[in-house]
């Protein structure tokens, strides 16, 4: 598996449970590097290694080799992985070509306002391909998540029916790996304090991220009830 983000790790967990031998190649220095705190990365790294997954960190893909299909994965640090199947999960680029051809403004996605309208107010867009204003982040962002796609679709539908309501959602995400559930509300990274609740060793814990005393994000592992409460506090 190329990439140790949500997709790569979820596929790895499923493959292991189907009895397959799995190797992950990741160019960053930890799993889920772009989206979670190092504490969460370490927990899920250990979880996968405990389940028999081989993980090569700081290893970038150089090329594939094979006669009739992929037989070897060659990495830039001289590591070679024997393989009879490869899954690539390294992120996406938004499909914005149709918008560009229509003369609409794009910048890491199709630019829309809080009602889902593009530069041409007769054209709307929603989902992973849009770059939209987010009141919580206080800036424009492009999100790749089920929740965002669903809620943006509702916003666009209301606009089309002449009942416009501003998109007003705090981002949240989840990932199921083996029997473990990771749930996230808000986006950490800009915090100045972290509070841990529960037991990392027991596999049931939460990380609360604060900025100037205000709760801005929560990461929850195997604690769905408390997570539902936390969603209301961010």
Whereabouts are the PLM-identified features?
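Rossmann-like dinucleotide-binding cores of NAD(P)H-dependent redox enzymes
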Residues: 6-63, 145-148, 169-177
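Hydrophobic alpha-helical segments, especially N-terminal targeting/anchoring helices
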Residues: 25, 74, 112, 209-211
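FAD-site-proximal beta/loop scaffold in flavoenzymes
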Residues: 68-74, 80-158
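Active-site- and interface-proximal helix/loop "cap" or "latch" segments in soluble metabolic
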Residues: 230-234
């Amino acid at each position: 598996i190329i990439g140790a983000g949500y997709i790569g790790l979820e596929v790895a967990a499923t493959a292991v449970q189907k009895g397959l031998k799995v190797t992950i190649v990741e160019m960053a220095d930890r799993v889920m590097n772009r989206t979670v705190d190092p504490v969460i990365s370490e927990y899920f790294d250990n979880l996968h290694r405990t389940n028999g997954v081989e993980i090569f960190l700081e290893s970038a893909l150089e090329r594939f080799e094979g006669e009739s299909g992929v037989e070897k994965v060659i990495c830039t640090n001289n590591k070679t992985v024997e393989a009879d199947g490869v899954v690539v999960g390294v992120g996406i680029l938004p499909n914005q070509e149709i918008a560009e051809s229509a003369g609409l403004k794009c910048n890491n996605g199709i630019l829309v306002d809080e009602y889902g309208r593009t530069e041409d107010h007769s054209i709307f867009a929603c989902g992973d391909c849009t770059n939209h204003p987010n009141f919580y982040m206080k800036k424009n962002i492009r999100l790749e998540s089920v929740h965002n796609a669903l809620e943006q679709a509702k916003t666009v539908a209301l606009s089309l029916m002449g009942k416009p309501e501003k998109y007003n959602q705090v981002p949240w995400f989840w990932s199921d790996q083996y029997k473990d559930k990771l749930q996230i509300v808000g986006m950490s990274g800009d915090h100045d304090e972290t509070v841990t609740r529960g037991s990392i060793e027991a596999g049931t814990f939460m990380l609360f991220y604060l900025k100037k005393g205000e709760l801005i994000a929560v990461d929850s592992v195997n604690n769905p009830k408390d997570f539902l409460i936390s969603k209301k506090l961010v």
